[in-house]
Each structure stands twice: as C-alpha cells, then as structure tokens.
Amino acid sequence: MSERWALAPVEGGGALLVPLGPEGLPAGEVRREGDLVGAVRSRPEVGRWVWRSTAEIYPRLLAAGVRVERCYDVEDAELLLLGHEGRLGEPRSAAAAWARLRQAPVPPDPPPRAAEPGSQSSLFEPEPVSVPFEGLLAVYADQQRRHEGTEHPGRMRLLTAAESAGMLVAAEMNRVGLPWRADVHREVLHELLGERYAGGGEPRRLAELADEVSTAFGRRVRPDLPTDVVKAFAQAGIKVRSTRRWELEEIDHPAVRPLIAYKKLYRIWTAHGWGWLQDWVREGRFRPEYLPGGTVSGRWTTNGGGALQIPKVIRRAVVADDGWRLVVADADQMEPRVLAAISRDPGLMEVAGHDGDLYTRLSDRAFSGDRDHAKIALLGAIYGQTSGDGLKNLAALRRRFPLAVAYVDDAARAGEEGRLVRTWLGRTSPRAAGGGDDDEAGIPQEAPGEGPAVEGRGEFAPGYASTDARARGRFTRNFVVQGSAADWALLMLAALRRATADMRAELVFFQHDEVIVHCPADEADEVVRAIRSAGELAGRIAFGETPVRFPFTTAVVERYSDAK
C-alpha cells in the first residue's frame, strides 16, 4: 500500500483522480470516473489519498461503508505550513494557495459554518471557492517543496500526516457517535433541576435558588446576570471583581451558597439541558463535529454541542450498548512527560521513565517527599507561575532539572521578544501582533496559585494576541509543551485507530488527554492493551528513543461517570 493518488469530486457524484510520484507530481494520466465512492473502493492498494479537504469527501465515503487508511488533507497542510512561515491568519483554502502560486488575488476563506446538531459535517459546509484539479495538484506539489524548506522537514511531514490522520478520526467519531441514553439524561435533569415550567422559564430548583439569592440581598437580584450580582455585593459593602466561584468562596455573605449552587445548575441547564438533549442526541448517539487543531496549540475543539465540557453528573447518560463496554483512558501527567521528552533533561526523563505517579517521584528527587510542592513547581514552570511560592519551588526545580526549566524559559523569552516558537514537530505559534479570541488559544489563562486549585487547567489572560510581553511569554512558555502534547496525541490516535481497525471497537470520544473506545465486552482487554501500546508508540515516533513513558489510567465501565 505505497501508492499515493490525488482525488477530487466532480458534479454528478463522479471524481477526477491521478497517481502521484515521489515529488508530488502526477505519475500518469488524469482519469474521470462516474462514481467517487466506487473509484476509492476499487483501489484498496492506494496507501494515501490526497484531497482538498477531509470534511468534503470522507463523510461521503463513510456513509457508503468505505474506510481509508491514510489521507493528505491539502487545506490542513496549508494551515500548518502558513503557520511555520509566520503567516498564520492568511487564507488557508486550496483556492487561496492556488491563487498565491499564480500571484492572483487571494480569495478569503469561507466563514465558519454554524453548528448543525446531529448532522454530517460536510452537508452544511459553506460553498468553497472552486479550484481546478490541476490547481490542486500544483498546490500539493508546492507543499512538498515547502515541507523540505522547514526547520525540521521530517518532523513537519510527520505533523502533517498526523493531523490528516486526526481528520479521519474526527470524521469517523462523528459518524459513529457517542452512546447516549436520553431517558437517563432526562432523569438526571429532573433530579438536579426539578420540574420544567411552561413557557421555557427556569426550572423549579433554579427558581428556588434565585429566590434565596434575592432574599439574602434583601432585593430582587438576577443571579444569571454577573453585573447584577456584582452590583448587589457592592451595595452590601463587598467589592468583587467577578462572580467566579473561587472568588465568591472568599466572601462571608448568605447569598454565596445559593449563588454558587445556582451557577452550577444554571450552566447544566443552559449547556446540557432539555434543549441540548433534543437538539444533539439522535437514535441513542451524540454526534459532535470535532475540529482537530481547532486551537493554535493544536488541541481539538468542537463546532457546537459542548462535547469537551460534559459535566460529570451528565456523564451518567453516556452508557454502553447492551453487551458492550466503554474503555475510558486518561494519559497520566501527559504534559510533564512531554516536557521531559522535548527538553531531553536526563533527570526529568528518568523521573518520567516510570508508569507510577510522576509527582511523587519528582518530590523524592527534589522536594523532600513533598508531592504538592513538586507538582506546583513543575506546573508553575510550564504555566508561568514564577512569583511567590512558585518562584521558590521553581528555583529548586531548576537546580535538579536545569535543561527542562531552561527549555520553557527560552520559549518564554522568545515570546517576550516577539519571536515565534514551535512544538517539537513544528506547529508554530502565531505572531504577537496577531488577533484572536484568547479562549481559542488552548492555553490556560489562570496561573497556578492565583485562582482555583493548581491543576494546570486555569486560564491566562490575555493570550497570544496580547501586546504585553510577559503575557506573551507565558503563552509561548506553555505553547511548546501543550502543543507538543497535542502532536503526541494525534500520533496516539492514529496508532489506536490502526490497532483497532480489525475489531468491532469504535473510537467515540477524544479530548486533550482522554480517549473513549466503545467495544464489545469481550474486546475490552484487547482495547486496553491497544491504548497503552498506542501511547508508547506515539512517544517513540514523536520524540525518538527516550526513557520517557506515556502510560494511561484505564477503566472498563458500562457508564462514563463510573470511570472517574
């Protein structure tokens, strides 16, 4: 399966296709066939299909029962190459790339498509600017040349292949869907929120909590409006900057308890309530549209549906089919292990070379057995907590693991100076002058120790678009680690997809460091082994031969909520 063919759909359901040579140029005559699906199905020897967009073609193949082993997504490759060239933000469509080759006016990318609950993604894509087949071939050949001109061509080609594999996984997960029991979901909502009132108003429990908040303030207050809450506290002589839970918990006022409870339930009602259930769950499956590389760091996002923010209590509705199981796997302390691999720090690689708790081993090496201090120090180095206790802990970390700390320090310095940084495989940060929504950066925006409990999951503000040098440095410090972890995750998914190809098992969910496989009960043990093997294989492929291990904590359950 070493052949590589280019493929493009044409009107009437047909296709243009041609074999490609080693340089990316056509190695034969262009053929026109009347059935795109049949053209792919009849060529099982093709090792990689080159096409404009996976979202444009692959759902159609999957609907016909055709699965491809590998692909090359031209538009995704264009995005990665533009980023490497410091041009992130320029149009990344095949039509735009073709226009640049001809020095013609470059068309803008189509606007993002609104989420269509329960739909197959390609059916609702905005109409792209057309590009002739010869244009697609020219863009692909040019991309092969541009790969050769990158800082590490082999790594960059690997990243492109891995991201294209991620596109296949995303389309397959959308097709299969996450098992979802609507009846269980409704039971959970009734248990949490109480009865629904006619007219779409707040359910009973939210209304009760809202009344408690108002009673505590002595006047009518809308707990769903942060400005109203902040104003009410101010009138009570209490200054608050926001209504975030960690800030409210510091306040001694009778409104705090019902307000926190209200906010938690309100979030469930609006994000995963009855309306969400009606829109997004069809025939026992939740089918979000996954967007690989949806953030600049390479982490995935979804187009609507809130798949990556499913509350634990709602996970009770994620139930395996009869006779099947959910294999839920979490990568253990993934980002610290990735830092060990990319920094090549001998001491940290030795710590990360075992399957056990990394922070415990770290504490034994440098923090007199104090696991909490070890964790704060390492996450502080990654996320930029370099003051107060974080500075003291960082000094201890720097003495024992100088290469690891220097790696992220150098990345931070580059960001402060307005320079670009790259992940291990070559994904490149945006320029400091770029714009964008900080929440889309995939980078935490709350430093460890400055807000909620340290988990490396808060959020820094601003972000990569900031004109503040220190904020930019915090972004790039984390980018090189989080982005490299996202690269590893792509390779893990590709390896797992390949390992389960001959099973009935289905990849049904992925976020950051967690994967769920839905499989017959008698395949569960084999799936667990496949996940663990995929993690180790991805580590070797991404980072070479290092002592670093990439273990998973796995649980075989009937219900997602039982895994945590």
Label the model's feature ranges.
Residues 517-521:
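Short beta-strand-to-loop capping motifs
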Residues 481-501:
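Short amphipathic alpha-helix segments
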Residues 74-153, 167-168, 172-174, 197, ...:
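Helical catalytic core of nucleic-acid polymerases
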Residues 319-321, 489, 500-503, 508-512, ...:
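A structural signal for short secondary-structure junctions
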Residues 1-92:
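Conserved RNase H-like, two-metal-ion catalytic cores of nucleic-acid enzymes
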Residues 1-25, 119-125, 129-310, 323-325, ...:
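Conserved "right-hand" nucleotidyltransferase catalytic core of DNA-directed polymerases
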Residues 53-54, 58, 189-222, 401, ...:
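Polymerase palm active-site segment centered on the conserved acidic dipeptide of motif C
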Residues 298, 330, 489, 496, ...:
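Hydrophobic, well-ordered secondary-structure elements that form the walls
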